Amino acid sequence: MKFGVIGAGQMGGGIAQVAAQSGFDVVVHDQKQEFLDRGKGVIEKSLGKLHEKGKLTDAPETVLGRIHFTTDLQDFADCDLVVEAIVENQQIKNDLFKQLGQIVKPEGILASNTSSIPITALATASGRPAQFIGMHFMNPVPLMQLVEVIRGYQTSDETARIVTETAEKLGKTPLSCNDFPGFVSNRILMPMLNEAIQCVMEGVAEPEAIDGIMKLGMNHPMGPLTLADFIGLDTCLAIMEVLHQGLGDDKYRPSPLLRKMVQAGLLGRKSGEGFYKY
């Protein structure tokens, strides 16, 4: 199988790395060469760490050699499976999938790593809804076991079978869910993070205390505000907006503080500052 990944960022790079580690030939696309170079550097560093710990079957250079980096979408023409991992914006994704639907070979499967946008809507844009599915990986991809597999309204049984088997070949545990905003993971997780942010806004406690209470009292490995910073506050806001709009319930209304921090460019780890400084 030839594996394609759109987006060389944190998620796309991780998906590409895991696919290459699993023996797949991988094509990775991004809009600019500098984005590809940055993504390649992150993959190299990650592979180096795994090699030092004895957790890599092949040499790092062998794994990296399986990945082709490109700025040309035409390079996906002969891919069997293409996973999109770009910005969480439905219109941008729709435009991309419309192009991919015309480029990728007719039997090729298109998948989205979206964390909240309805799969059925993206599938319609692709022009091949039977061969479209959600593959929601968790961050960081090389370490996290779960892949949420989300069928759209017209996703075929064969597409679901192939994608489930592929996720297993990547060393992941695929779990199926239906096409609702936020699926399972973010429908449960994001309101918790949003409520932690609301606690900061209302002065219930300082960020360190909120995180400490959830770690020590609820046995969470990472506090909710640290996790929000790690995910990216802009991503958290985008997901909350999809939940709020898609489900029509004000319990999913984004915290005003979350919106204000995103407007201020305080996006968390990726920008150097969020609820903590990095």
Curated annotation (Swiss-Prot):
<protein>
    <recommendedName>
        <fullName>Probable 3-hydroxybutyryl-CoA dehydrogenase</fullName>
        <ecNumber>1.1.1.157</ecNumber>
    </recommendedName>
</protein>
<dbReference type="GO" id="GO:0006635">
    <property type="term" value="P:fatty acid beta-oxidation"/>
</dbReference>
<feature type="site" description="Important for catalytic activity">
    <location>
        <position position="136"/>
    </location>
</feature>
<dbReference type="InterPro" id="IPR008927">
    <property type="entry name" value="6-PGluconate_DH-like_C_sf"/>
</dbReference>
<dbReference type="GO" id="GO:0070403">
    <property type="term" value="F:NAD+ binding"/>
</dbReference>
<dbReference type="InterPro" id="IPR006108">
    <property type="entry name" value="3HC_DH_C"/>
</dbReference>
<dbReference type="InterPro" id="IPR022694">
    <property type="entry name" value="3-OHacyl-CoA_DH"/>
</dbReference>
<dbReference type="GO" id="GO:0019605">
    <property type="term" value="P:butyrate metabolic process"/>
</dbReference>
<keyword id="KW-0521">NADP</keyword>
<dbReference type="Pfam" id="PF02737">
    <property type="entry name" value="3HCDH_N"/>
</dbReference>
<dbReference type="InterPro" id="IPR036291">
    <property type="entry name" value="NAD(P)-bd_dom_sf"/>
</dbReference>
<keyword id="KW-0560">Oxidoreductase</keyword>
<comment type="pathway">
    <text>Lipid metabolism; butanoate metabolism.</text>
</comment>
<dbReference type="Pfam" id="PF00725">
    <property type="entry name" value="3HCDH"/>
</dbReference>
<comment type="similarity">
    <text>Belongs to the 3-hydroxyacyl-CoA dehydrogenase family.</text>
</comment>
<dbReference type="InterPro" id="IPR006176">
    <property type="entry name" value="3-OHacyl-CoA_DH_NAD-bd"/>
</dbReference>
<dbReference type="InterPro" id="IPR006180">
    <property type="entry name" value="3-OHacyl-CoA_DH_CS"/>
</dbReference>
<dbReference type="InterPro" id="IPR013328">
    <property type="entry name" value="6PGD_dom2"/>
</dbReference>
<keyword id="KW-0443">Lipid metabolism</keyword>
<keyword id="KW-0276">Fatty acid metabolism</keyword>
<dbReference type="GO" id="GO:0008691">
    <property type="term" value="F:3-hydroxybutyryl-CoA dehydrogenase activity"/>
</dbReference>
